């Protein structure tokens, strides 16, 4: 494999994981903060808020997992190495 392609693949894999984690991380923090605020205002709605929060966490975390899949594809099944 060309060393430049190998180095670029490693850098791209690191960027894929790092950048894919920034947005969902900030979103999860914001969502959790608003969920705590909503539960503090309406304690009787805790079950609904918690259910919606966990579902939204799953959707947000899927974006990070997609970044991990791209990084693993670049490292182990590199389409540019040929």
From Swiss-Prot:
Its main location: plastid. The record marks 61 as: Reversibly protonated during proton transport. It is a multi-pass membrane protein. The chain crosses the membrane at residues 3-23, 57-77. Keywords: ATP synthesis, CF(0), Chloroplast, Hydrogen ion transport, Ion transport, Lipid-binding, Membrane, Plastid, Thylakoid, Transmembrane, Transmembrane helix, Transport. Pfam families: ATP-synt_C. GO terms for molecular function: lipid binding; proton-transporting ATP synthase activity, rotational mechanism. It is found in: Plastid, Chloroplast thylakoid membrane. GO terms for cellular component: chloroplast thylakoid membrane; proton-transporting ATP synthase complex; proton-transporting two-sector ATPase complex, proton-transporting domain. F(1)F(0) ATP synthase produces ATP from ADP in the presence of a proton or sodium gradient. F-type ATPases consist of two structural domains, F(1) containing the extramembraneous catalytic core and F(0) containing the membrane proton channel, linked together by a central stalk and a peripheral stalk. During catalysis, ATP synthesis in the catalytic domain of F(1) is coupled via a rotary mechanism of the central stalk subunits to proton translocation. Key component of the F(0) channel; it plays a direct role in translocation across the membrane. A homomeric c-ring of between 10-14 subunits forms the central stalk rotor element with the F(1) delta and epsilon subunits. F-type ATPases have 2 components, F(1) - the catalytic core - and F(0) - the membrane proton channel. F(1) has five subunits: alpha(3), beta(3), gamma(1), delta(1), epsilon(1). F(0) has four main subunits: a(1), b(1), b'(1) and c(10-14). The alpha and beta chains form an alternating ring which encloses part of the gamma chain. F(1) is attached to F(0) by a central stalk formed by the gamma and epsilon chains, while a peripheral stalk is formed by the delta, b and b' chains. Belongs to the ATPase C chain family. In plastids the F-type ATPase is also known as CF(1)CF(0). This is ATP synthase subunit c, chloroplastic. It comes from Chlorella vulgaris. The gene is atpH.
């Amino acid at each position: 494999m060309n060393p430049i392609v190998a180095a670029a693949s490693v850098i791209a894999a690191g960027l894929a994981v790092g950048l894919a984690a920034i947005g969902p991380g900030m979103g999860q923090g914001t969502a959790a903060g608003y969920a705590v605020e909503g539960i503090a205002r309406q304690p009787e709605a805790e079950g609904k808020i918690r259910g919606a929060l966990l579902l939204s966490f799953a959707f947000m975390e899927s974006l990070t997992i997609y970044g991990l899949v791209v990084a693993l594809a670049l490292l182990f099944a590199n389409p540019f190495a040929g």
